Amino acid sequence: RISLRVLAENAAARRSYEKAGFVQEGVFHDMELLDGAYRDVVFMAKLAEN
């Protein structure tokens, strides 16, 4: 299992991860404070193939 988190607003990165086989597992709202504003974070994971 490989997991990652990415800012929800970073659509290009999310598409790239999806193309690499990652799937969205959840969203944490207002989790990261960046430039004075709270941002949503998407958690993604890729599981080993059996």
Please tell me what each predicted stretch does.
Residues 3-6, 23-39, 43:
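Conserved catalytic-core motifs of GNAT/GCN5-like acyltransferases
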Residues 8-26:
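Conserved active-site alpha-helix within GNAT-family acetyltransferase domains
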Residues 47-50:
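Acetyl-CoA-dependent GNAT
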